[in-house]
Regions:
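Short active-site neighborhood of thiol/selenol oxidoreductases, capturing the structured segment around
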Residues: 59-75
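N-terminal "domain-start" segment that seeds a small globular fold
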Residues: 28-56, 76-79
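Bacterial N-terminal signal peptides
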Residues: 12-24
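Structural microenvironment flanking redox-active thiols in thiol-disulfide oxidoreductases
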Residues: 78-120
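N-terminal secretory signal peptides that target proteins for export/translocation
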Residues: 1-10
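Solvent-exposed loop/turn segments at secondary-structure junctions
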Residues: 72-76, 105-110, 133-138, 167-169
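Thiol-/selenol-based redox modules, centered on thioredoxin-like
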Residues: 155-215
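Short, internal strand/loop/helix patches
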Residues: 119-153
Length: 215
């Protein structure tokens, strides 16, 4: 897929990364060295069929599922992950029926070696981490979500999504989430609310409460 994606926005674009050129990429600031993680998470390579993410997603039916797409060195993405850890995951009860998937893409030059430090911000070992070096997942998710700046597609990254327990990944692309927040300038903020960790936490709690079989 290619080239009709464009770049715009207040973040500076750092250039072409593995075929992501001409995407709408609001870029991030300079990467600062992060602390080493004592126990590095397992990072799975995402293939052209979105495996093993697709298999994991469908296996986890019955759970509320959170999916995050980031570059592991983007400062705004790292802030989003930190908010996710502090405002959402750290405050959930231990028995919460929830799964977390984080797809990392090299939008501004991040690599799989940067994932452990980014993963540490979530304060949990329960998240599944995937590395998508081609950026194909971001293009695919952009189409699924209908991310547009005017008439131009916006590459999907720095996005935070909630899927209900009954969501099934049956088509070629991922299913539509029930809720999405983002940190991408230029999107319709009425349709796609900008990232707010505390509000996202409220939405997660609401969906957990609705789906709790004891309620």
């Amino acid at each position: 897929m290619s080239s009709h994606f464009r770049s715009f926005g207040s973040r500076s674009l750092y250039g072409v990364v593995l075929g992501l050129s001409a995407l709408t990429l609001p870029g991030c600031g300079d990467h600062k060295a992060a602390s080493q993680v004592e126990s590095a998470p397992k990072v799975m390579l995402l293939n052209g069929d979105d495996q093993p993410l697709r298999e994991d997603f469908n296996r986890d039916q019955g759970f509320v599922r959170l999916m995050v797409v980031v570059d592991p060195i983007c400062p705004e993405c790292l802030r989003g992950l930190a908010d996710m850890g502090d405002d959402v995951l750290a405050k959930l009860p231990k028995e919460a029926r929830i799964k977390v998937y984080v797809v990392h893409e090299p939008v501004i030059g991040g690599s799989d070696k940067d994932i452990p430090a980014a993963a540490e911000l979530l304060h949990t070992t329960l998240a599944h981490h995937y590395w998508n070096p081609t950026g194909d997942f971001g293009r695919q998710m952009s189409q699924v979500l209908g991310l547009l700046h005017g008439s131009s597609p916006v590459f999907a990254w720095d996005i935070y999504m909630i899927y209900p327990p009954n969501a099934v990944w049956s088509g070629k692309g991922p299913p539509q989430p029930s809720y999405l927040m983002h940190q991408l300038p230029g999107l319709d903020n009425q349709k796609f609310p900008p990232w707010d960790g505390k509000l996202f936490a409220t939405k997660v709690s609401d969906i957990l409460a609705i789906s709790d079989p004891k309620n």
